[in-house]
Amino acid sequence: MNWIKRKQNRLKGYDYSRNGVYFITICTKEKRNILGRISSAPEAVTELSAYGIIADKYLMRIRGLKNYIIMPNHIHMLISIESADDTYKSIPQIIKSFKILVTKEVGFSVFQRSYHDHIVRNESEYQKIWKYIDENPIKWQEDCYYNQRGHHEWEE
């Protein structure tokens, strides 16, 4: 049987429990717009669906969460691992736990199997990513994850 080889998303050999800041993007399955919608007046903000509210609840429990935005079909977040003690989990453990908790409460698998990560290397990069997260709703229609199909699927 020929199996499709999945692309390795993590940096090979990197310890994702190391102190540092990580920029994470999690997409919904099939990039469906089920987490909310972007309002246009007077300022672009995300209006969360019931699923988005559940995701928000569990995001707020992530230790080291510095900034985040829930978009209609994806979530961006900055997570800081700041301690060498055993109470901090690795990034893969944090993301897995988050996805499991949301899935259990929603009742179906919300997110794609994997996620995108970027190790933040310096303060300048940190500030640039922070700004990107904050401005994401304003630039929704320019976003690479923008999906007109099923514009407000969560209302169906």
Specify the residue positions occupied by each region the protein language model found.
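Short catalytic/metal-binding and nucleic-acid-binding patches
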Residues: 1-156
